[in-house]
């Protein structure tokens, strides 16, 4: 029977919570003025590397997103040291931050589906109008 929820997944889940707390309370970088959310963490099998996926409250501005990711990368050593104290791991993983655009893509897809459904309902209500298109 295979492990469904192994150690890397458990460590990643706990690390996600701890990094979110650290970003909220400890990081005072002005480039991170927008609210930062940790949407996920992926751990390597040997727990030496972690990919941290983040989203920002005001993610419409690409320059602000790039500046935010750069600020997180520059603060990764500090975040790592705080993470080591909070989690008491033998090896604190090397952190790499990525912007998670899945939320934005999900909203875009939801809007597309909503528009199609609305258009379909309009065609059902007014079948004569659709023949003119």
UniProtKB/Swiss-Prot annotation:
Q: Is Metal-binding set as a keyword in this record?
A: no
The UniProt entry lists the main location of this chain as cytoplasm
NCBIfam families to which the protein is assigned, alphabetical: rbfA
For this entry, the protein name equals Ribosome-binding factor A
Q: Does the keyword Transmembrane helix apply?
A: no
The record's similarity note reads:
Belongs to the RbfA family.
Where is this chain's protein located in or outside the cell? Cytoplasm
* GO CC term (a single one): cytosol
Q: Name one GO molecular function term.
A: ribosomal small subunit binding
The domain of life for this entry's organism is Bacteria
The record's HAMAP family line, in alphabetical order, gives:
RbfA
Assembly and partners? Monomer. Binds 30S ribosomal subunits, but not 50S ribosomal subunits or 70S ribosomes.
Q: Which UniProt keywords apply?
A: Cytoplasm, Ribosome biogenesis
Tell me the Gene Ontology biological-process terms attached to this UniProt entry: maturation of SSU-rRNA
Its biological purpose: One of several proteins that assist in the late maturation steps of the functional core of the 30S ribosomal subunit. Associates with free 30S ribosomal subunits (but not with 30S subunits that are part of 70S ribosomes or polysomes). Required for efficient processing of 16S rRNA. May interact with the 5'-terminal helix region of 16S rRNA.
């Amino acid at each position: 029977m295979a492990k469904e929820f192994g150690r890397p997944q458990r460590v990643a889940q706990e690390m996600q919570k701890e990094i979110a707390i650290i970003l909220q309370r400890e990081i005072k970088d002005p480039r991170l003025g927008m609210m930062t959310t940790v949407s996920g963490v992926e751990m390597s099998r040997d727990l030496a590397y972690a990919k941290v996926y983040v989203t920002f409250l005001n993610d419409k501005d690409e320059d602000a997103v790039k500046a935010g990711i750069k600020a997180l990368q520059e603060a990764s050593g500090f975040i790592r040291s705080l993470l080591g104290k909070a989690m008491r791991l033998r090896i604190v993983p090397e952190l790499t931050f990525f912007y998670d655009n899945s939320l934005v893509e999900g909203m875009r897809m939801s809007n597309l589906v909503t528009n199609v459904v609305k258009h379909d309902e309009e065609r059902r209500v007014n079948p004569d109008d659709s023949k003119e298109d």
